[in-house]
């Protein structure tokens, strides 16, 4: 984490408030789970990842969507599974199959909502719950992230609604990929800021490279973060991935 924070500082990017660790916010997550449990919106799930992938899913459901195997188990069936020694996860009992959100780049997006995990079998709050509670606690009103998470937005916005949290607005942007159209990795060369600096680029050049990739600067133009904030326009952001010139 310190490396990422240092990279932001080098690029001249700042943030509001202190850096908050999720490991310090466990009471908030458990409070949210209690809210849902009190409304009978949770249930224990004993399925393994392999069992979920092998189970038949509903028509049009995305790969890996939970098929509801443990949703309607009787108390006797739950007791039998508990006796086997397997620690259950806790899932949301979703009341809908889909939910619609507005995205700055994609417009109205309707996506499937399944019974997401709220608490893992090892007792750790799950990602979908944590990010929703974090956004609510910090009054986040806009989320900008990679478009690989677009399908997560409907279920997260639905969960926020159940917890009386105002869902944020969304902007899902294309990813930076390698020449083969895959996620960047160490084998692709200088993919971190430290790598770029070691290769001879300045922080100003790196900032310009990033800004020009989303239409906010001309190649070679020297820009600052405040200038980019003033220029930002979601309509300028390309709708296709940026092929990163790592090597």
Model region roles, listed by residue range:
Residues 1, 26, 49, 63, ...:
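Alpha-helix initiation and N-capping motif
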Residues 1-59, 147-165:
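N-terminal Rossmann-like or analogous alpha/beta NTP/dinucleotide-binding catalytic cores
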Residues 16-18, 167-170, 217-223:
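Short, surface-exposed acidic
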Residues 21, 48-50, 173, 209, ...:
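Residue-level "edge-of-site" marker
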Residues 37-38, 136, 197, 211:
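Alpha-helix boundary recognition
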Residues 50-186, 192-197, 245-246:
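Active-site cores that bind ATP or allylic diphosphates and position pyrophosphate for catalysis
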Residues 80, 97, 182-247:
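Non-catalytic terminal extensions that flank enzyme cores
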């Amino acid at each position: 984490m310190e490396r990422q924070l240092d990279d932001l500082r080098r690029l001249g990017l700042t943030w509001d408030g202190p850096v908050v660790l999720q490991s310090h916010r466990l009471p908030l997550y458990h409070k949210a789970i209690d809210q849902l449990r009190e409304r009978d919106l949770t249930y224990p799930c004993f399925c393994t990842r392999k069992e979920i992938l092998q189970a038949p899913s509903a028509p049009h459901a995305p790969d890996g969507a939970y098929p509801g195997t443990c949703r309607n188990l009787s108390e006797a069936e739950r007791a039998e599974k508990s006796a086997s020694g397997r620690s259950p996860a806790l899932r949301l009992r979703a009341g809908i199959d889909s939910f619609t959100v507005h995205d700055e780049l994609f417009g109205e997006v309707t996506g499937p909502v399944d019974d997401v995990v709220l608490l893992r079998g090892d007792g750790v709050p799950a990602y979908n719950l944590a990010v929703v509670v974090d956004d609510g606690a910090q009054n986040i009103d806009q989320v900008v992230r990679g478009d690989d998470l677009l399908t997560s937005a409907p279920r997260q916005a639905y969960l926020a609604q159940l917890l009386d949290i105002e869902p944020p607005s969304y902007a899902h942007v294309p990813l930076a990929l390698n020449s083969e159209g895959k996620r960047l990795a160490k084998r692709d060369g200088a993919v971190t800021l430290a790598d770029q600096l070691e290769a001879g680029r300045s922080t100003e050049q790196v900032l310009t490279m990033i800004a020009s990739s989303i239409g906010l600067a001309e190649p070679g133009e020297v820009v600052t973060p405040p200038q980019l904030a003033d220029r930002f326009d979601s309509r300028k952001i390309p709708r296709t991935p940026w092929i990163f010139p790592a090597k």
